[in-house]
A protein has these predicted regions:
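Short secondary-structure boundary/hinge segments and terminal tails
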Residues: 51-52, 168, 190, 271
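Short terminal or interdomain "cap/linker" segment that borders an active site or interface and mediates
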Residues: 160, 165-202
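Positively charged, Gly/Ser-enriched RNA/tRNA-binding surfaces
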Residues: 20-37, 48-51, 62, 68, ...
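A short beta-strand-loop structural module common to alpha/beta enzyme folds
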Residues: 40-46
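Auxiliary tRNA-acceptor-end handling modules of aminoacyl-tRNA synthetases
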Residues: 1-19
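Catalytic cores of Mg2+-dependent Asp-rich isoprenoid enzymes
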Residues: 11, 51-57
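Short low-complexity, flexible loop/linker segments enriched in glycine and/or proline
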Residues: 56-60, 174-176, 278
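A positional/architectural concept
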Residues: 41, 75-79
Length: 283
């Protein structure tokens, strides 16, 4: 056998033996918790029409999609993320179903990143979607589900960092930034690149008040106490409502007895445009 046929391409790997057994065990434990919360399994295709993952929907950039054509000439793409596929499926089959809808999923996703980035191009994604309920209680449910799922795997020391994209968007609107500038600034702040952010704001001649608040967003993280100050700094209703929403979610999580696992980070701004409200991650 030729030597090169024994190796995998850059960005993919074999999983076997004890590592694979451990992976299956963790997936099972997380799925048990999803089921206990009433989330139903859903399976979407490994590839879809390209437009499902198009830039307008706000998922992975086109250059990072694995694209190909079928015999009819349709442009198809391997899924880089489950959320757009689940949203499409819900819109097709569940429009007349009573809200909210609860789905959970497990499968591999594919992103054609540069080999120099050192990232896996095929990863397993497991998640849950709560559709049709925009309340603070729904936000708290998903955060609670994440906490309880991690605890169910045996983890004890972790934190859930919670952000609110609307806080940033409100200040950008108030400062009169266009969509392109907002998108670039979002990337700078997400990467904690304050020099790039400040240079951009100076080029756009943003007034001193808004510039100072936008530059501070990257450093706005911590416990519940700093949210009040963040609300005062924002001179617009949209941003203040975002802070109020975070406080409401925290109140619900406190009732669940989960407040010790929660912190806040207003500089956490997802590159996915379909995340318009609360976002969170564990570390």
């Amino acid at each position: 056998m030729q030597t090169q046929l024994l190796h995998t391409p850059e960005g993919v790997r074999d999983i076997y033996g004890r590592e694979y057994a451990k992976k299956l065990s963790v997936q099972s434990l997380i799925h048990d918790k999803f089921s206990s919360y009433g989330y139903q399994d859903i399976q979407t295709p490994t590839f879809e029409f390209f437009d499902v993952f198009s830039k307008e929907i706000g998922t992975t950039p086109s250059r990072e999609l694995y694209k190909f054509f079928d015999k009819e000439g349709n442009t198809l793409a391997l899924r880089p993320d489950f959320t757009p596929s689940v949203a499409r499926c819900a819109a097709k089959y569940f429009m007349d179903s009573p809200a909210p809808l609860r789905f959970c999923y497990l499968g591999n996703t594919f992103t054609n990143t540069s080999n120099l980035q050192g990232k896996l191009k095929e990863v397993t994604q497991m998640g849950a979607e709560l559709i049709g309920d925009e309340s603070a209680i729904a936000d708290a449910e998903l955060i609670s589900l994440m906490i309880e799922s991690l605890k169910n795997t045996g983890l004890k020391r972790f934190q859930i960092s919670v952000g609110q994209v609307e806080y940033f968007k409100g200040i950008c609107d108030d400062a009169g930034l266009d969509a392109g500038t907002e998108r670039t600034l979002r990337e700078y702040i997400s990467n904690k690149n304050l020099f790039g952010a400040e240079t951009l704001l100076m080029e756009k001649e943003v007034d001193e008040k808004h510039k100072n608040v936008l530059l501070r967003i990257a450093e706005m993280f911590g416990g519940i106490d700093f949210l009040a100050e963040a609300g005062e700094l924002a001179g617009n209703t949209r941003s203040r409502n975002a802070i109020r929403r975070l406080e409401e979610v925290f109140s619900v999580l406190k009732l669940y007895g989960l407040e010790e696992y929660v912190s806040f980070d207003l500089g956490m701004l997802s590159r996915y445009n379909y995340y318009t409200g609360i976002i969170f991650k564990a570390y």
